[in-house]
């Protein structure tokens, strides 16, 4: 299976509960079927997507807001690992900001940022010229997920599983 990114759209009250009782985050269940509109499985695209969205050369977030769409510096409990990382979170206000920014990005912009030779350290490694289509497909899902969660007034909790 490898390392996959999972994002959950949650009500702000649920996020507050997670921040006061970090065991609450363990009640989230990943949906790998794609049937839950409040859960998104980004498969192994997370590192490449983060890079295209303005992340650094390791595939993790930078100060660029769109690069924080999958992982970021806000964690529920740094010592509580869900799979490979702690649970990251974005408030409903941050979700709305990122949803707007993702909505402004085009496939052409992302294609211009795609440099497989510069992505050698980005999981899952071994990027080729053809992999851009794989990433663009997941970008479209990510953008739609953010639009939906923003419209619902949801926060987002994410982790690498």
Roles of regions detected by a PLM:
Residues 1-137, 141-144:
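Acidic (Asp/Glu-rich) sequence patches and key acidic residues
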